[in-house]
A protein has these predicted regions:
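Short, flexible, mixed-charge acidic loops at enzyme active sites
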Residues: 20-27
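Conserved nucleotide-sugar donor-binding catalytic segment
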Residues: 27-104
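Low-complexity, flexible helical/coil segments
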Residues: 13-17, 40-47, 83-84, 117-129
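C-terminal, non-catalytic tails of nucleotide-sugar-dependent glycosyltransferases
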Residues: 49, 105, 109-142
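Conserved donor NDP-sugar-binding/catalytic core segment of glycosyltransferases
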Residues: 1-20
Length: 142
């Protein structure tokens, strides 16, 4: 399949850019796989590059999707291949103001967010299928 996204590793550092002796891939056990990434997300936006043709299908992100990077990564997987580059190419600074938290909310909150993610992904993939069928019918007409 065609590569739709690339994800690279990053060295985790503190506020003073001192290494915390861990990379984002180690922290998140990063790799491709829909269910793996529903359980523990590998996709961090600053470490991702996404093919423009994929973004045309992935965007817009639904309002009820809280983790935008995960949405993009999971849908890129649905469209084709996601390649993971093991080399840390940037520093990923951890500090009190990070949007990505090291801890999760309640188990109920996590389940609800994942449920909404799965439902929205299913809806989007069905939209793609319908759109592709309509385009195919248009092409087949004499």
């Amino acid at each position: 399949p065609k590569v739709m996204a690339v994800v690279h590793d990053a060295q985790i550092v503190d506020e003073k850019l001192s290494s915390l002796n861990e990379t984002t891939f180690e922290w998140r056990d990063s790799k491709a796989g829909f269910w793996k990434n529903m359980k523990k997300n590998s996709y961090i936006g600053c470490c991702m590059a996404v093919r423009r043709s994929a973004l045309k299908r992935i965007l817009p992100i639904p309002d009820n999707i809280w983790i935008h990077d995960q949405w993009i990564g999971l849908l890129a997987e649905q469209l084709g291949k996601v390649v993971f580059i093991e080399e840390p190419l940037i520093y990923y600074r951890r500090h009190g103001g990070n949007v990505t938290e090291l801890t999760h909310g309640s188990i109920t909150s996590m389940i609800k967010k994942r449920y909404h993610m799965i439902m929205e992904i299913n809806r989007r993939v069905k939209e793609w299928s319908e759109h592709d069928k309509q385009n195919q019918r248009h092409i087949e007409k004499p």
